[in-house]
Amino acid sequence: RMREEELKRTGGLTPEVRAILEKGSEYIESIRKSNDAIPGEEVSEKIYRMELLVRRIFQQTEAHPENARDLRKMMDYYLPMTVKLLGAYEELDRQPVQGENILNSKKEIEDTLDTLNSAFAKLLDNLFEDTAWDVSSDISVLQTMLAQEGLMEDGLKK
């Protein structure tokens, strides 16, 4: 009974899910601050896309808290490493002389941002898997019912 009241009061989110969402907000803020600190337009676009993807992942998790368990690697490894790499990029970018090692490291980080963005996009897409199954199932049932009632034209059948 008390657990039900607690869940109702917190929007149906368990303390674990709330903690994930709060930590997620901190990561998003950190990503944004790095983006503000890094002037390069091309790398800034990559970071902006990352912020958008990560924000959507957490929005989807808030709407569907059962997805929180799928974020463990993202929370424990991918996001901390992302923040670390962005911090390193900021430091490298601030150097007055951009020598070969600095340029190579920055390029490597930029390429890794592309990889991370692809991974975050795939993770976001995976969070919609159950929704996609539900939609397909609902459409299939609807088409069957319409066909049984003789309400479906041949052009609408798959």
Residue ranges, per PLM feature:
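Membrane-proximal, non-transmembrane interface segments of integral membrane proteins
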Residues: 1-62
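Soluble C-terminal extramembrane regulatory/interaction domains of multi-pass membrane proteins
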Residues: 45-158
